[in-house]
């Protein structure tokens, strides 16, 4: 039986009091070290934010006092959050962050991702019970986004100012297999209470290190993010693989799961299977026409399981219309703005290039011709350009060309491997996915730490807007809201 959780059913109670067990995704809150003033936590289920209040003399030397919102976790994990203090504060050494401890005692071994009120950002740790705290400093000042990861006996602290990429430090520290892990706040003053807000909180149980891609899967969260504010909310979760949401004109999310397409209603959380007839082996390359009336799908057809393109009405159909023939894999990425063509990555002439096909006549037109991989093509809303990603320089970067294939030019230039450029409906922005440089540039694997990035369509410096555990299936297809204010995507965790 699959486990499902939809945020629509949680909105009846907007706030959770500290006395309650089960606060958001955490088990409980407690005051470690018996601070003179007891802390508390409020959880806003609508925004999925935690407001923490806490006192405490310090988290240093051999004794800690702080407010702790935790859950017990075994093995590897990643906890991430967007953090901010409320108010100017009293002591510049007030601190907030993410922590993992053996015990709830004041002298327990621990490792944390700690942000101070001043410029200090550090991975703090106590190597044995009763020992003095030590630290590894991180050269990020006043970060907004933080992450604590456990991988075996090594803890990694990553942090970034909004818009930038993570910087990371690490420490080998063999804590218990099961730890208390979560969020903390300490005022550094016994008689002072400080406040902080933790948003975009994710508790991630990653895929096993030896998992088999495309055979073994972990759970999925469908998320919606306000591009301007950066606030992310999980709208639907499942223990199986959900992939690649599109955003329909009537505010539903169209996504793939196990070869089928489903619509998720953002207003009420209802899920409806889309009728695709015989096409029941669809991959995650599905798109909507610009007018929102048609769906394009990529179905693995025949004995060869060739990825083949079809179109059907947005309401579904028993008989999707076949567009490409059995001439090699075709991976769909978009309609032309006039709805007359599809643009796709095609295996033709023993290589993958960018092609278009006339839906009415079936005539294919080759637009790129390189021995290296060109992929993920998408029309600009005005129809003048096609953006895509190419590994022709040795790194997967964004490129663009005229709609007829002329004037190819590179668009992004940094060290990351960039995939899946998607235009906002108003034509002003491009959002895309970036893998770190140690990932094979020809691959977009599952279950990696990736960035969702944003750049002006007119050109400019990209900025990171989301720090995500995902990759394949996260944002393969266009997922902007019709008003160009939000995007949908998939993140992953074992659920």
Language model feature labels by segment:
Residues 3, 41, 148, 254, ...:
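Assembly/interface hotspot detector across virion components, adhesins/toxins, and nucleic-acid enzymes
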Residues 4, 158-163, 424, 492:
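Composition- and surface-driven signal marking solvent-exposed, interaction-prone regions
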Residues 1-21:
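Bacterial Sec-dependent N-terminal signal peptides
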Residues 207-495:
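Sequence signature of WD/YWTD-type beta-propeller architectures
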Residues 20-211:
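Extracellular glycan-recognition regions
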